[in-house]
Amino acid sequence: IRASYGRVVKDGLTFYDSVRFPYLTLIGYTGSGSWNNGSGLTETQVGSSNLRWEKAKKADIGIDARFFHERFEMTVDFFQDIRSGIYQQRQSVPEEMGLPSLPWANVGEMKSWGMDGHISYTQPLGDNDKYLIVRANYTQSMNKITNFEEDLKKYDYQSAVGYQSGVNRGLIALGLFKDQADIDNSPRQDFGNYLPGDIKYKDVNGDGIVNWDDIVPLKYSYVPQIQYGFATEFNWKNFNVSVLFEGVSRVTYFKGGNMYQPFSGSTVGNVITDFANPANRWISREISGDPATENPNAKYPRLYYGGSSNNSQSSSFWLSDGSYLRLKNVQVSYTLKNQFLKKFGLQKAVISMIGDNLAVWSKEKMLDPAQAGDNGTVYPVQRVYTLQLNLSF
C-alpha cells in the first residue's frame, strides 16, 4: 500500500494567455483625442501586481499486489488534485471602474479525481517458451470547476461552476417539428426562420421563448473520462501471437460543419449519400405523398436551400457518443534459430505479420470515432498491414 501527498506550483502561465507581462501597466498613444496638436496617452493594459503561481494539492493512494506465485499482478491508484489560483482574466469588474482593459488574477479553482490501474496474469504452459499472458488497463479521470471568473449569469446552469471543464453545451432538441400545428403550439424560437421538418428545442427556463438563455450543459466533453485497453500474448516455442484492444468512453462531440451539409461546395465531403435515403430525413407529405415521411424523429431535418440558422445551433440533436473499442494491433511472429542461419553469421531471424487499426466498434458509422469531432477535416486513421523481417547478428 502506498500513499503520497504534496503541494506544487505551476511555473508558467496557461497556453492560451495572450498577455506576456500581465503585471505591467502599459501606456500607449491613442488617436481618438489630442492635446496641443499631439496624440493623447492612455493605459493600454492595467497591470496586476499581486499575481502568484497557480497551486495544487495532490494526493494519491495506491495498491500493488502479486498473487499465485507472482502470476497475477495488480496496481491500482486513486488520486485527487485540487487546484487554486488558476490564472484568469477578470470578468466581473464593473464598467464604472473605467478600466481600458480587464486585469488578470489568480481566481480559478478546480477539483480533479479518479483512478488508474492495470492487471496482468501469466499462465505457464510447460517450458519457459510456452506461456499465455493477459493484460488490462483502466483509467478514469473526472473534474469539477469550483470557482470560475465569469460575468453574472441569469441562471445557475449557465455558470461553469459545478460542471466538468469543457462540458459540451447546447440546446435540448425535442426532435423535429411535425407540421405547422406543431410550430403554432410550441414556444417561439429566436434563431431565424423555421418550418415543419426543422429542429424543435426545449424552452428550459419556461419563458415562452427559446433563445441563448436555454443553452445548458449537455453531456461530457471532447476529452474522454474513461480510457481502457486489454491485450493478450500467446507464445509456443518459436510461434508468438499478440493482440491489443483500446477504447474510450464517456466522451461526446458535436456533428457539424460542411460534413453534414448535403450539396455543400466544400472539399471536406458531406453526407449526401446518407441524406439520399428517404428514411433518414423529414420529407413533406406534399412531396412524398405519404404522411409517414413527416417523421419528427428522423435522423436529419428537412432539406433546405442555403443555410439554416435554426438547425445549425449546437444542440443535443447533433451531439454524438464518441465511445469506441478498437482492435489496435495484431502481430503474428515466427522465430528461426538453426545452424543454417549461423553459416551466414545470424543468431536468429524473426518473420512477422502485423496489422494496425484492423477494426473498430462504435455508434459512429460515418467517420472514425477518434476523429469524428473534426467532422471530416483531418487525414483519416489508416488500416496498415506490415510484413516484417528482423535479423539478429
Regions found by a protein language model. Name each.
Residues 221-256:
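Glycine-rich, aromatic-lined ligand/substrate-binding cores of catalytic
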Residues 64, 191, 231:
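Short, surface-exposed charged micro-motifs
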Residues 248-349:
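Extracytoplasmic gating/loop element in the C-terminal half of outer-membrane beta-barrel translocons
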Residues 1-168, 310, 314-393:
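Extracellular/periplasmic, surface-exposed regions of secreted and cell-surface proteins
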Residues 83-84, 220-222, 250-252, 369-371:
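A short local loop/turn or secondary-structure capping micro-motif enriched for an aromatic residue
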Residues 105-108, 122-222, 260-263, 269-295:
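Conserved small-residue
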